[in-house]
């Protein structure tokens, strides 16, 4: 695992298909135990996670992150799974959702749960109070930085809902994260966003949805 902040660790890379990479992220700053965002592809990092204190909670951003690893993570660490309830049909084929997410709120781990449907019906982002006063925004596939350096949204014609996704992006534009971390990407894994530039990044992604829709 690679440490990218004093309280944030990145799992080794996985390549589901050419041009796409994924990671999971272990946040060690939560008051109720370590939090794993997204999901690993293998158990290769389990021992390092255990050495860092294990996984008390796991958060999925949407159904595409569900797979056999969910049950393995829960079995190894006894973790509590937080995930959007509207995607129970897909996630539930692998394991049980322990904390069903439905609306925007700050939970007992200090994480702000922000429903951002559009990429999928249950897509959800998470705003985390990171170390040194910085905030980390975990965006799943809702918005990410492409290999061309252009911010894009996870819009797939026929599968995603353009209008709903646009509304979700407008919502995210009001945030001011210091670090933006998507679950699948073609460029950098975690992107530092200087100052108030985030709203411009979101507008860039929204423009891309308009072109495709």
Write out the residue ranges for each language-model feature.
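Short, compositionally biased "basic patch" segments
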Residues: 1-26
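Metallo-beta-lactamase
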Residues: 9, 15-17, 32-36, 43, ...
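Short, solvent-exposed secondary-structure boundary motifs
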Residues: 12-20, 92, 103-105, 115-116
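Active-site-flanking structural segment that lines cofactor/substrate pockets
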Residues: 18-27, 33-34, 40-48
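Residue-level detector of beta-strand structural context in well-folded domains
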Residues: 23-25, 102-104, 124
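Acidic surface patches and DE-rich sequence motifs
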Residues: 29, 107, 130
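Active-site HxH/HxHxD metal-binding segment of metal-dependent hydrolases
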Residues: 41-109, 200-207
């Amino acid at each position: 695992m690679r440490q990218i902040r004093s309280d944030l660790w990145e799992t080794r890379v996985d390549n589901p298909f050419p041009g796409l990479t994924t990671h999971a992220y272990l946040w060690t700053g939560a008051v109720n135990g370590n939090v794993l965002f997204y999901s690993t592809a293998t158990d290769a990092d389990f021992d390092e996670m255990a050495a860092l204190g294990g996984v008390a909670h796991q958060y999925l951003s949407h159904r595409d992150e569900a797979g056999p690893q969910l049950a393995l993570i829960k079995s190894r660490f006894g973790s509590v799974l937080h995930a959007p309830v509207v995607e129970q049909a897909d996630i539930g084929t692998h394991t049980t959702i322990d904390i069903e997410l439905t609306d925007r709120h700050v939970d007992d781990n200090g994480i702000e749960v922000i429903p951002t449907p559009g990429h999928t019906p249950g897509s959800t982002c998470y705003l985390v109070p990171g170390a040194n006063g910085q905030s980390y925004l975990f965006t799943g596939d809702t918005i990410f930085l492409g290999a061309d350096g252009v911010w894009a949204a996870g819009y797939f014609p026929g599968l995603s809902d353009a209008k709903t996704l646009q509304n979700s992006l407008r919502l995210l534009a009001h945030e001011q994260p210091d670090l933006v971390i998507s679950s699948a990407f073609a460029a950098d894994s975690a992107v530092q966003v200087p100052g108030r530039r985030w709203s411009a990044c979101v507008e860039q992604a929204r423009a891309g949805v308009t072109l495709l829709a």
